């Protein structure tokens, strides 16, 4: 199973995703593909994302049963915690903030 959710992306990316996946709700696409096809679809997302954001989730042989990847401004980051995938919420980017 493969799920891609997008926000604030250009119409051409939505159209491209609709070629491969079923849009079950606005911005949420679902399908079943191999790892190779999944990588090709994600490459299209990377190229066409613009200023939007996206998350791709797929079935995987892990303790949690899934894995995911994110791209864009509203990023959350996957973190491996002893074989279990957890989500790290990244702080908002700020010009005033000094990196640690």
Model-predicted segments: where are they?
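Basic nucleic-acid-binding interfaces
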Residues: 1-5, 9-100
């Amino acid at each position: 199973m493969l799920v891609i959710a997008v926000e604030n992306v250009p119409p051409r990316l939505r159209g491209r995703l609709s070629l491969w996946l079923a849009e079950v709700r606005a911005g949420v696409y679902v399908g079943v593909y191999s790892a190779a096809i999944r990588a090709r679809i994600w490459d299209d997302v990377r190229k066409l994302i613009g200023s939007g954001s996206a998350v791709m989730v797929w079935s995987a042989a892990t303790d949690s049963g899934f894995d995911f990847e994110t791209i864009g401004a509203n990023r959350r980051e996957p973190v491996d915690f002893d074989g279990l995938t957890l989500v790290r919420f990244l702080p908002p980017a700020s010009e005033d903030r000094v990196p640690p």
